């Protein structure tokens, strides 16, 4: 069987992770990387060629699945429907509140072109979403809890870096251990935002910056920190470079419910990741395989992780899966 031919749009942390993940899957090959930058300035780790993103349309006969590696704020809302005109696509759109409208926009383009587009792939949305559905279906009487961390939040880190006087910064989301244990114990607590997570900032200041002023701006920032207990730590650039340049993340989905007359049941799924973008990339590549198979079977339109059987993610045949993993 010929390899699944993959293209990548965008060559940042996620795009580089997808490139590496493809190399770990023998049934796939990377055909091309598409970038908004001058292709001659982009050095890739594989043998794939690099092209301007505007030239992608010319490759519709050479690529089975295009993996879109842009950001959710401005890139994917435009790129999702755009590339669905010509390719089966995978993306990691993660603005939860806007997923329904994004789905509709991509679906309209994919239905028209006859392509398959799997949106909002990754771990949240993605694998966590699947486990929320599983928990509700199996334990209809109960409560679902999602905890994130310990992990670096890129959006919140960017928000801190935009503050005047900040040279560099990262922000970690931390699940509050007492809250997690109460859920695991089957107490079904009603938890506020502040009771579920804390935020921790590590900040390098510009020379002469006003530390108390910066700290106050951080802890009172609406939509980011004002609803959380936030700790701000000021450190040197050397300490920052030594200890805070990784991109770890993770979390838990816990369904606490009842079955039978009064049996307490806990269903839990957890992740502990050294690299958020590299793990997300691996999920994207697995769903690229599924998108290709769905397309070959005559499917079209937008899909989410809820629409795709797990068996389609695996390179193994249905018979192998029944024998080895069932």
Curated annotation (Swiss-Prot):
The reductive amination proceeds through a sequential ordered ternary-binary mechanism. NADPH binds first to the enzyme followed by L-2-amino-6-ketopimelate and ammonia, and the products are released in the order of meso-2,6-diaminopimelate and NADP(+). This is Meso-diaminopimelate D-dehydrogenase. Substrate binds at residues 94, 124, 148, 154-155, 173, 199, 249, 276. Pathway: Amino-acid biosynthesis; L-lysine biosynthesis via DAP pathway; DL-2,6-diaminopimelate from (S)-tetrahydrodipicolinate: step 1/1. Its EC number is 1.4.1.16. It catalyses: meso-2,6-diaminopimelate + NADP(+) + H2O = (S)-2-amino-6-oxoheptanedioate + NH4(+) + NADPH + H(+). It comes from the Bacteria. It comes from Lysinibacillus sphaericus. Homodimer. GO terms for molecular function: diaminopimelate dehydrogenase activity. Optimum pH is about 10.5 for the oxidative deamination of meso-diaminopimelate and 7.5 for the reductive amination of L-2-amino-6-oxopimelate. The rate of the amination reaction declines markedly above pH 9.0. Induction: Constitutively expressed. Not induced by meso-2,6-diaminopimelate.
């Amino acid at each position: 069987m010929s390899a699944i031919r993959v293209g990548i749009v965008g060559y940042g942390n996620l795009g580089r992770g997808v490139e590496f993940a493809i190399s770990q899957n023998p049934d796939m090959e990377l055909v091309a990387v598409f970038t908004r930058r001058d292709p001659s300035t982009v050095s890739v780790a594989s043998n794939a060629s690099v092209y301007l993103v505007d030239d992608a349309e010319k490759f519709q006969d050479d690529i089975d699945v295009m993996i879109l590696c842009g950001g959710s704020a401005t890139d994917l809302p435009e790129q999702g429907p755009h590339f669905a005109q010509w390719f089966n696509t995978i993306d990691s759109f993660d603005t939860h509140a806007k997923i329904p409208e994004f789905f509709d926009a991509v679906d309209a383009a994919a239905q028209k072109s006859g392509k398959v587009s799997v949106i909002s792939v990754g771990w949240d949305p993605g694998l966590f979403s699947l486990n929320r559905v599983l928990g509700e279906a199996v334990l209809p009487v109960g409560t679902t809890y999602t905890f994130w961390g310990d992990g670096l939040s890129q959006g919140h880190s960017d928000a801190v870096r935009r503050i005047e006087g900040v040279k560099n910064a990262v922000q970690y989301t931390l699940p509050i251990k007492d809250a997690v244990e109460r859920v695991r114990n089957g107490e079904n607590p009603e938890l506020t935002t502040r009771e579920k997570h804390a935020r921790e900032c590590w900040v390098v200041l510009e020379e002469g910056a006003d530390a108390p002023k910066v700290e106050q701006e951080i802890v009172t920032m609406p939509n980011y920190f004002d609803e959380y207990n936030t700790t701000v730590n000021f450190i040197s650039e050397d300490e920052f470079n030594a200890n805070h340049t990784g991109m770890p993340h993770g979390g838990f989905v816990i369904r606490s419910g009842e079955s039978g007359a009064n049996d307490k049941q806990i269903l839990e799924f957890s992740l502990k990741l050294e690299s958020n973008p590299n793990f997300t990339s691996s999920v994207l590549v697995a769903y690229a395989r599924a998108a290709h198979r769905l397309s070959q079977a005559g499917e079209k339109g937008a899909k989410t992780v809820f629409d795709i059987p797990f068996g389609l993610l695996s390179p193994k045949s249905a018979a192998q899966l029944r024998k080895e993993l069932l």
